[in-house]
């Protein structure tokens, strides 16, 4: 769709990253951290044009002098003023569009509180004057992006993980499970175990370095105990990483110990089940007749499912839990980091979807509650 005139905007607001672009495109045009930064100190030099807040990459690059805040925690918007800044930045600075000229599709976490959807709707129509909007559940969009309408999605991002069983395009709310264990926790855990090695990472700025180490070097072991033995016996699993100041650090078993916490949350001092067991429990909460379809369509989605080895390990773990006769398939699309956005892009450009938008007129007549009647 080269005609960006009235094409819909698709904005996937994650706890860690905001993905935004135009419906019909195959990838988001803008991907930036969901952060708002405010100066720690008043500017010393008058007239330096220091802003009172920075969003996204600019906040990231000036992180040394700022206090960084994430307006989305565990997938759910908790700070609306900052969130408005993120949306403003998305429309005006990243996409460079006038929001009053384009319908906008927003995404939400599964089990998002009703009041939250209403507030999102209100801000779009009242602050940004959107002509039309829609709110879609993230995991459902990931499933659409994989070309399915039935399956179970494990969506794991920076702030939260969910297992969402979906049948014929509808999420089954009674069987959705939430796990407050995701990318940010793994970054914190890696910071902690690197400290045990004698490297010190403490500030928010250093946390970003550790996040980069995690994304570049970590992987999921097929057999954790065996991998630990290999790591202890030789240096074959060690990798080095150069810090911004030129210092080189070595990382060994931390490479697979970090994401192992997804399967063994006790590593983080959490009592919850691992992601494999959460998927299994989610399936077991569904009607017995659809379980077979769910086992055969396990879709991974989100940045925290990007570790090499995660699909094989999931296959192994779920096979061990499920009945022996059942066929289990894990689908891990290479673009799964952005599959929520891609699903939104597909949905918003379908001709059949055009009647689903909530228009400004409907909003003016019914108020924010309209979102519960039109988006499900």
UniProtKB/Swiss-Prot annotation:
Family to which the UniProt record says this protein belongs: Belongs to the actin family.
Example of a GO MF term: ATP binding
Record-linked Gene3D superfamilies: 3.30.420.40, Actin, Chain A, domain 4
Keyword Nucleotide-binding recorded: yes
Protein name: Actin-5, muscle-specific
Protein's cellular compartments: Cytoplasm, Cytoskeleton
Main location group: cytoplasm
Keyword tags: Acetylation, ATP-binding, Cytoplasm, Cytoskeleton, Hydrolase, Muscle protein, Nucleotide-binding, Oxidation
Matching InterPro entries: Actin, Actin/actin-like_CS, Actin_CS, ATPase_NBD
